[in-house]
């Protein structure tokens, strides 16, 4: 609490033209976006987009983007969004600032995500669980093999040929 600052600013209450007080939140967001299961990403990502799964309440600034949906399992969606295929798609169809990805709502909503049965999502869900377990045990753990296996499953979901996979991977 800063009662002197608030008292000073309250002197100008008649001048304010909006409900946003100078000591209040600017463009506050609904609390539901911070609670429960969600995917969080930095709005500006270097090298490739990075999406993190969270199953606890956490409050982040607007430099982060929060995703909540009931159409897909959130761990499945985390795996797909972190895939090389989605990075390739965002590089060509999303917003870029130089070589940095800008993760925004519109490009993400444009990703043609497959609506598939939970049983087909399960291999990716299991791999994301394995990554979360390894990272919880050791934040520096090498998860490259698990990420490559997720990429393989994502390529299969979209029916990519070997030549298309080479294009995505820049080979």
Predicted features along the sequence, with ranges:
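Polybasic, glycine- and aromatic-enriched phosphate-binding surface used to engage nucleic acids
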Residues: 1-120
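Non-catalytic DNA-recognition/assembly elements of restriction-modification systems
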Residues: 4-12, 114-171
């Amino acid at each position: 609490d800063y009662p002197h600052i608030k008292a000073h600013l309250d002197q100008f209450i008649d001048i304010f033209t909006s409900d946003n007080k100078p000591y209040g939140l600017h463009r506050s967001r609904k609390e539901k976006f911070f609670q429960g299961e969600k995917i969080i990403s930095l709005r500006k990502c270097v090298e490739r987009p990075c999406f993190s799964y969270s199953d606890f309440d956490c409050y982040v600034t607007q430099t982060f983007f929060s995703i909540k949906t009931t159409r897909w399992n959130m761990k499945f969606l985390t795996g797909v969004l972190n895939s090389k295929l989605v990075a390739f798609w965002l590089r060509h169809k999303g917003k870029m600032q130089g070589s940095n990805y800008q993760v925004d709502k519109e490009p993400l909503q444009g990703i043609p995500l497959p609506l598939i049965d939970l049983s087909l999502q399960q291999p990716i869900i299991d791999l994301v669980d394995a990554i979360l377990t390894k990272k919880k045990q050791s934040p520096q753990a090498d998860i490259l093999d698990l990420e490559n296996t997720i990429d393989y499953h994502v390529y299969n979901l979209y029916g990519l040929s070997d030549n298309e996979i080479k294009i995505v991977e820049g080979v």
